Amino acid sequence: TSLDHAIDMIEDVMIHIEIYQPQHITPEINQFLDLVEKSAEELLTAVRLLKTYKKSQKEIHVVIDRINACEKEGDLLYIHSMRDLYQSNADAVSIVILGKIYKSLEDCCDAFKDVTKFVEEIALKYA
């Protein structure tokens, strides 16, 4: 399911950081991690609201919109992070390592957006 995929993407991020052992955690990595954390918290809120869907329809859609906004922010962050990385004086190995970590974090943000589609399907089923 899409939820399994999102969890797998979080695990991939941890694996990439473990394998590549970046010299330091960049501000961009921290920004991505903030987006992932916010998306996870919002997803938990959406799932809890499903219990009272008839009363919470509008609120669920607001929460889904916030998750989608995090995904869009993740896309922009990825573009800016990669641009800045390629324009930096970093060595080739650091560019490859950070690029892979940034991509796995951006994929993680995408996966949460995919889960919102699943939440919407559940909500429609029980509407």
Q: Where are the language model's segments positioned?
A:
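Cytosolic, long alpha-helical scaffolding segments
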Residues: 1-127
